[in-house]
Amino acid sequence: MSFSLVVLGAGDLGQRVAALRAAQGDTVWALRRRNLPMPAGIHALNGDMHQAEILCQLPVKADVLLFCPTPDARTEHEYRRTYVDALRKAMETLQPKRILFVSSTAVYAQNEGQWVDEDSPAESDAFNGRVLREAERLCLSQSGNAALRLSGITGPGRNMLVNKALLGEGLHNTWSNRMHSDD
């Protein structure tokens, strides 16, 4: 069964999901800031998701909104603008049937080797974790939505941990959960 998908934040992850779903026959729209080539079968739009006139070019009531943008800067203001304000505006303007919000394990305060699982409290002391948690709550305020807390993505161009390990600079006796970008 085919469905409609809108991707806000069609960077590496968003573009991969968009391409996969388009190849499956779904109707896919993808928005990103930079004017770069997009795989075939995707209705590509370049622009700033913070601008109402850009959002209005996307379909209303899509089956799924995949919300996976990146802030312009690593500041509390930009995180709030990108994850909370833009998500709220997208929810109001696009009225999708379901939202998948790509969050992060930054929502957890445990960062000194503690074991973290789905029962761990999401009470980060860092601004990025607090803002992401606020955005998760906004997303989850509507039934059927989901927040995905990705802990780290590996794959082409994402070699920092591998490079550190090869140089002997990696952390020893440390657990980490990673996901390959193809998955």
Name the predicted role of every residue range.
Residues 5-9:
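Conserved N-terminal Rossmann-fold NAD(P)-binding element of oxidoreductases
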Residues 10-11, 150:
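Glycine-rich Rossmann-fold phosphate-binding loop(s) that bind the pyrophosphate
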Residues 14-15:
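N-terminal Rossmann-fold NAD(P) dinucleotide-binding loop
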Residues 43-63:
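Conserved Rossmann-fold cofactor-binding substructure of NAD(P)-dependent oxidoreductases
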Residues 62-100, 134:
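NAD(P)-cofactor binding segment of oxidoreductase domains
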Residues 88-125:
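Conserved Rossmann-fold NAD(P)-dependent oxidoreductase catalytic core, especially the SDR/UDP-sugar
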Residues 104, 134-157:
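Conserved beta-loop-beta element that borders a ligand/cofactor-binding pocket
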Residues 150, 160-163, 169-183:
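Substrate-positioning beta->alpha
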